[in-house]
Amino acid sequence: MNMIKDFLIISCTGKNDKIGLKINNNFFIHDFQNKIQNNEILVSTILNLTNKHKVKIDQNFSILINNGPGSFSTIRVALSVAKGIKISNKVKLFGFKNSYLPQFILENIEVLINENLIE
């Protein structure tokens, strides 16, 4: 079982793009209305969400990233942003396949964390 408590989950595959933030046992979701075309939108949304909830992004924080399948460019943008956060803040980074998360809700994400993450 993984010891992932606080995390950012990025599920941007070109369709129903979302990010989620679990911090201090609270879970927040941001739905993107349009396909993520560039990293500026994703980065500013992540910064706004983490600043709003006063998140400390450090080695105790994890990022979960959807590896697809989906839009190659959208997945690349999301992965690049996640890797940038990993490098700059020394967070743990995990990937998952789109099929392992049938619905973007906390209960399903917790099952995903316990069973289907790729380090």
What is the predicted role of each segment?
Residues 6, 59-62:
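Structural motif
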